[in-house]
C-alpha cells in the first residue's frame, strides 16, 4: 500500500475539421482503495513516448515533477491531428482495490461551445498479499 502510479489517459485525437482546446480531464470511476492525487499533461517528446503505466521511483519512469506540465492551460489540438500532449493521472493505492479504474472524461471547447466526451480506458492495480 502507499505505492504511487502514473496512468496515461488516451492520447487526444481531433477527428473534426476545427481545432479544439481541452480544458479538463478526469477518470470517471475511481474505486475505493485508489486515490487520484493529481492530473498532469506532458509532451510525448519529453517522455520519449507514451508511458501507459509507470510506478513512481522506477528507473524507467519519467521524472514528471521535473517536466513541463501543460495542464495549467487548455491544450490545443489542431483539426485532424493527434496531440503531442498526453494526460496522466497520478494515483495512490490506499487499500487493496476491488475494482478497476475506468472511463476517462475529456472536457473541451470548439468554436466557443463546450463539450464533454467520455472514452473507454481501464487500469487494474493489485496489491501483493
Language-model regions, residue ranges each:
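Non-catalytic macromolecular-recognition regions in eukaryotic signaling proteins
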Residues: 1-129
Amino acid at each position: 500500500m502507499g505505492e504511487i502510479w502514473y496512468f496515461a489517459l488516451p492520447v487526444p485525437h481531433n477527428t473534426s475539421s476545427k481545432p479544439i482546446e481541452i480544458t479538463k480531464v478526469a477518470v470517471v470511476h475511481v474505486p475505493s482503495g485508489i486515490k487520484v492525487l493529481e492530473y498532469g499533461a506532458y509532451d510525448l517528446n519529453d517522455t520519449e513516448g507514451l508511458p501507459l503505466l509507470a510506478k513512481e521511483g522506477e528507473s524507467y519512469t519519467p521524472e514528471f515533477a521535473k517536466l513541463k506540465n501543460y495542464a495549467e492551460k487548455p491544450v490545443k489540438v489542431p483539426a485532424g491531428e493527434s496531440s503531442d500532449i498526453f494526460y496522466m493521472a497520478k494515483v495512490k493505492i490506499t487499500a487493496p482495490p476491488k475494482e478497476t479504474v475506468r472511463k476517462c472524461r475529456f472536457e473541451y471547447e470548439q468554436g466557443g461551445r463546450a463539450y464533454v466526451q467520455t472514452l473507454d480506458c481501464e487500469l487494474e492495480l493489485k496489491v501483493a498479499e
